[in-house]
């Protein structure tokens, strides 16, 4: 990892941990102890090797025979998160992954309660959907096009059945390849 990427990831880690430090319950008790935050700061954070469409972050258990914990995991983030317009969302994604690192493997009620501590959580969900749509647009190689109303759904895979219909107008869908201009055609 080059110095610039290291600095970006370090800054992101610092931002998230400093926010986690101030999360308190109604009795003014902190949700995350200094020890937990110190352990989180030692977790390796890097980039996903392939930019997935729907995966914005990933926590992996290093030793599958042991329980997920800060000393037994690493976090990978989608590179697209580091565009300026997504940087605040990147903080939320790292926070989400850190909750996993603290042993909260499933997205259960307890996990969601911790996740809801994040400021502007609803806005983060909107930004997350926006990022997913943008990634879908980039990766799309096929367009399902309605023969009746012209509605288009872009898809990354060719998987298609000839009996697909648009649910709004019941027009038959056609699977059309998306042809992008090459760099020589610009």
Predicted regions and their residues:
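Active-site recognition of the HExxH zinc-binding catalytic motif
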Residues: 92-104
């Amino acid at each position: 990892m080059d110095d610039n990427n290291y600095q970006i990831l370090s800054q992101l880690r610092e931002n998230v941990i400093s926010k986690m430090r101030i999360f308190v319950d109604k009795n003014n008790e902190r949700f995350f102890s200094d020890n937990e935050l110190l352990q989180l700061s030692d977790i390796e954070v890097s980039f996903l090797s392939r930019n997935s469409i729907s995966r914005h972050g990933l926590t992996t258990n290093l030793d599958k025979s042991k329980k997920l914990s800060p000393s037994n995991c690493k976090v990978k983030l989608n590179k697209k998160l580091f565009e300026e317009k997504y940087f605040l969302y990147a903080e939320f994604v790292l926070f989400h992954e850190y909750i996993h690192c603290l042993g909260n493997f499933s997205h259960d009620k307890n996990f969601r309660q911790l996740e809801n501590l994040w400021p502007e959580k609803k806005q983060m969900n909107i930004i997350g959907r926006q990022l997913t749509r943008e990634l879908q647009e980039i990766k799309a190689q096929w367009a399902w096009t309605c023969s009746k109303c012209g509605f288009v759904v872009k898809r990354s895979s060719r998987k298609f059945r000839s009996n697909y219909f648009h649910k709004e107008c019941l027009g038959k869908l056609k699977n059309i390849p998306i042809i992008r201009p090459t760099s020589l055609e610009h």
